């Protein structure tokens, strides 16, 4: 994966793109499996609310059809531990929408168990974005697609698990390191069951691969609300510019 979404600026709107590749999932490797097992040990990775066996069965069958050689039992939790991606299921019923199940080992600053049961608006209310059309967006996610969207962050380390309890390393001008963390979010709908699968897939862009001027431009063009949400300030941007001699 070589897509650099920061080149298009920073946007918190739910910009859905038609899926660009038939690949939904990647089978896990030993490095990521070890990190997932550490997450299982140290934090809550699975939660559910008002789920049905019918939905679990349909989604698990879909995953098995996409990835060869997965090992039984073909349960949601067991399959999630065999994939690079984290998995979330969102439902709509009787005019309501909510996150009904989540198996997330690598959350980006949030608690999976707190998101489960929340509506789209409740989950995203602190993000500077327009969620006025959240209900329409949820329906589109189910009946259209499949979709993908990309979100990105700047980090000082290659950190897969950014759970709120995990300590982060601050930028050190004397020993600098910079990564762009990209989260590819894949949305696949199941119209008959009124739900969609949300797969979260991370990859890292190393410092020597970053288009540094494009990244600085994207950071400078953030709104004050976006900068606050991403914990970015002008001082940090200036440190990056100095580090890269821009």
Spans of model-derived segments:
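Extended, well-ordered protein cores
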Residues: 1-246
